[in-house]
Amino acid sequence: MEFSTSSFIFDDDTPPKCPLATKASFIFSVYIIIGLIISYLLQIFRIVRLGSSQGLSFSYLILGYIGVLNAFSNVIALQISPLTECCQNYYSKKQCFANTTGLIQVGSQVLIMGCVLMAFWMFLPRPIHFVAADDENGLPIPEPLSVTKSRKWRKASYGLLGVFTWGLFIICLSATVLSSNFAWAAFLGFSASFCAVVQYVPQIIKTIRHQSHGALSIPMMMMQTPGGFLIGYLLSRLPGTNWTTYMMYIVSACLQGLLLMLCMFYLHKEKSRRKREELQATLQEEESQRAVRILEAETGPE
């Protein structure tokens, strides 16, 4: 299928800072938004289905969310002013909407990743989520839940509160007093790229240590890895943006591909182990039945 490269409006008088979105880029942007939402819903559904977020690194999720928040604020800081000017003076309504899809992409990722964080927090494994109070002898009471929350639960709660506060703070700054501030945008872009690199380290370590992907959704990563490269390309075409805006997505896609291969390796290894165990159990059952038949043949009927 060939996509038309024609724009939504045909006006050669638009300045270079107001590029016209093509039909192809608009269609790809819509697909990316839908794909992002579906991919993160797959992660949420896996956590809910397992009833546990075991195997997911909290540092991985928090750093990833900070990176997305910073990238969203970077797009706001660089794009709001030129996009407003272009929409008021040069774009038609269709073209204005088409050129806001990049902002919608990153914004939808902020919202849905926040839902993933909440799902992680709600389904923390109970032995980690809560600790039991001590009885009169100083021994822990074996109860699944307790009023006294665990240290890790408090850490996750404070972490969520802190990152949501940070997100609200930088988004407000980027949309108001620091709009079109290139130094601020560069800081956000570099920090987003840094988080994109560092976030995968704790998850890779946790995956190798457990030798399992746990609650981490492989279908989510299979959708997001190629999508990350496409998002980076589409963001590079937006008015007012530069390489600090899309670099995070390129780096994230590369490292997520590495994590995906690691998870698929351990999944294949686990399936092979289960097949060997099932085969061994079948052989043992057949051997037991054969031994019973031999014993019955030797002893004969009573």
From Swiss-Prot:
Residue ranges constituting the PQ-loop domain according to the UniProt record: 175-245
Cellular localization per UniProt: Membrane
Membrane-spanning ranges: 25-45, 58-78, 104-124, 158-178, 182-202, 215-235, 247-267
Claim: Transmembrane helix is one of the keywords in the record: yes
GO CC annotation: membrane
Keywords: Membrane, Transmembrane, Transmembrane helix
Membrane topology annotation: Multi-pass membrane protein
Predominant cellular place of this UniProt entry's protein: membrane
Superkingdom of this protein's organism: Eukaryota
PANTHER family, alphabetized: PQ-LOOP REPEAT-CONTAINING PROTEIN, SEVEN TRANSMEMBRANE PROTEIN 1-RELATED
Name of the protein described by the UniProt record: Uncharacterized protein C4C5.03
